[in-house]
């Protein structure tokens, strides 16, 4: 009998994930790479994530629209895995158009994406306010979690419902009746006006209709036609609801697996996974952070790196790079190459530390424990590296970078087994080195 093998389709999609707690600089990378891809897709999260892009002397923060929108030849898609606040989306579309970029014909929104309603935001704030101290998650209050709750409870409202006023009104009345019972009887707060919300959301139909399509079919047909796709994640792997530092996580899957379920692109189309890693670490909100620096060094990292949340403006907690956590993220997302960002923030440090393992109850461990009860007890073990005390902003190649900066990058590669291909040495598009 003739031996046969199954052929594998040519992979034409790339996934880009954050490998830490979010805020790794994914926006700059997507903006830089978007001219190499025909389509950029946002596949999870909502307006709780902010991607910052610096170009032409401007700094722009996007929360929902993919960062590729500033490449005029790029098509942008908001996938089915995203939860959409229509008000925030309309404001963002207006912002992009005011900057001189066309959105119509270049932005498509999944008809299956779920909507964030006013009652989701209300419940988000009420739920968080009832928690105390270490129990607080540090939610952005944007209604993300409650919207995903409704999605998985199978009574969420989707974009497609905006296109049918009768269906929309029926679903809103049913949902708000249930939410008002919770708001009034459990939280003892004033109920929500259902008629006001119905009027507001019916008006979104005319505005959003030109952008709505079946993006699952659209993306797969475009891939079949030879188009290339970049799938852009929000937040980071360590905030993944299944694989992150639960319960201090987001409500979706920022890992590479979420790219397929959140876009409808099949796994066999994924050719590579780019992991974005900051040269140090930050975290917004509560949750375990083994390498956090609550001293002058942490303050210095925050000041130089301008570490304030793009969505909430909250001050980020700062610390040294954690290789234990990073290796875990690379494993669960199958990262094939690393993009190292904000290396320039370390330019004025004589000594740079990197966590290589943890001490737990007197034993050295190398695997990342995701459960809070264990992670809160680990102590980082550091390796010290020499700083470079110089700027690499003018370097046009890896060889032109300071030798100690090169050594830092090489150490990161050796410690993770993953090549670093992109190095950000400043916020601008041109302050980038490829290795």
Curated annotation (Swiss-Prot):
Q: SMART domains under this entry?
A: Adenylsucc_synt (SM00788)
UniProt-annotated binding residues for IMP? 23-26, 48-51, 140, 154, 235, 250, 314
Query: What metabolic or biological pathway is this protein involved in?
Result: Purine metabolism; AMP biosynthesis via de novo pathway; AMP from IMP: step 1/2
Instruction: List residues binding Mg(2+).
Output: 23, 50
The cofactor named in the record is: Mg(2+)
What does UniProt list as catalytic?
23 (proton acceptor), 51 (proton donor)
Record-listed substrate binding positions: 310-316
What domain of life does the UniProt record list for this protein's source? Bacteria
For the ligand (GTP), the binding residues are 22-28, 50-52, 316, 342-344, 424-426
Q: Extract the InterPro entries matched here.
A: Adenylosuccin_syn_GTP-bd, Adenylosuccin_syn_Lys_AS, Adenylosuccinate_synth_dom1, Adenylosuccinate_synth_dom2, Adenylosuccinate_synth_dom3, Adenylosuccinate_synthetase, P-loop_NTPase
Biological process annotations from GO: 'de novo' AMP biosynthetic process; IMP metabolic process
Annotated membrane-spanning segments are none
Recorded E.C. number(s)? Answer: 6.3.4.4
User: Which Gene Ontology molecular function entries are recorded, alphabetically?
Assistant: adenylosuccinate synthase activity; GTP binding; magnesium ion binding
Listed GO CC annotations: cytoplasm
**Keywords from the named record:** Cytoplasm, GTP-binding, Ligase, Magnesium, Metal-binding, Nucleotide-binding, Purine biosynthesis
Where located?
A: Cytoplasm
- Similarity comment: Belongs to the adenylosuccinate synthetase family.
Described function: Plays an important role in the de novo pathway of purine nucleotide biosynthesis. Catalyzes the first committed step in the biosynthesis of AMP from IMP.
**Stored PANTHER family:** ADENYLOSUCCINATE SYNTHETASE
What name has this protein been given in UniProt?
Adenylosuccinate synthetase
Its lineage reads: Bacteria, Pseudomonadati, Chlorobiota, Chlorobiia, Chlorobiales
């Amino acid at each position: 009998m003739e031996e046969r093998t199954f052929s594998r389709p040519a992979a034409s999609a790339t996934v880009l994930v954050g490998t830490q707690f979010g805020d790794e600089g994914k926006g700059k990378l997507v903006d830089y790479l978007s001219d190499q891809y025909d389509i950029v897709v946002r596949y999870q999260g909502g307006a709780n994530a902010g991607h910052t892009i610096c170009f032409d002397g401007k700094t722009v923060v996007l929360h929902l629209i993919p960062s590729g929108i500033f490449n005029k030849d790029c098509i942008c898609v908001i996938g089915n895995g995203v939860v959409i606040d229509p008000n925030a989306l309309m404001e963002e579309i207006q912002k992009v158009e005011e900057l001189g970029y066309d959105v119509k014909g270049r932005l498509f929104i999944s008809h299956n994406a779920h909507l964030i309603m006013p009652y989701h935001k209300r419940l988000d704030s009420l739920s968080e306010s009832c928690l105390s101290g270490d129990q607080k998650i540090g939610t952005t209050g944007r209604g993300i979690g409650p919207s995903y709750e409704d999605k998985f409870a199978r009574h969420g409202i989707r974009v497609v419902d905006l296109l049918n006023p009768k269906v929309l009104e029926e679903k809103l009345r049913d949902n708000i009746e249930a939410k008002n019972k919770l708001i009034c009887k459990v939280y003892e707060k004033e109920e929500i006006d259902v008629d006001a919300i119905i009027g507001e959301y019916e008006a979104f139909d005319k505005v959003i209709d030109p952008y709505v399509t079946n993006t699952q079919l659209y993306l797969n047909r475009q891939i079949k036609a030879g188009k290339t796709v970049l799938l852009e994640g929000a937040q980071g792997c360590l905030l993944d609801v299944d694989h992150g530092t639960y319960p201090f996580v987001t409500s979706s899957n920022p890992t590479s697996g979420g790219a397929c379920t959140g876009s409808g692109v099949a796994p066999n189309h994924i050719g590579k996974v780019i992991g974005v890693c900051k040269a140090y670490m930050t975290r917004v909100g509560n949750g375990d952070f083994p390498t956090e620096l609550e001293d002058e060094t942490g303050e210095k990292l925050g000041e130089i790196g301008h570490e304030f949340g793009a969505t909430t403006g909250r001050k980020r907690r700062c610390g040294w790079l954690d290789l234990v956590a990073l290796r875990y993220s690379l494993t669960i997302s199958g990262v094939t190459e690393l993009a190292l960002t904000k290396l320039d923030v370390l330019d004025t440090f004589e000594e740079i530390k990197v966590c290589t393992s943890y001490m737990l109850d007197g034993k050295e461990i190398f695997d990342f424990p995701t459960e809070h009860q264990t992670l809160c007890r680990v102590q980082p073990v550091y390796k010290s590296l020499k700083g470079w005390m110089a700027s690499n902003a003018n370097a046009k190649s890896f060889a032109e970078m300071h030798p100690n900066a090169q050594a830092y990058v090489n150490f990161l590669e050796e410690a993770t087994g993953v090549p670093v291909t992109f190095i950000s040495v400043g916020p601008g598009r041109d302050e980038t080195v490829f290795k």
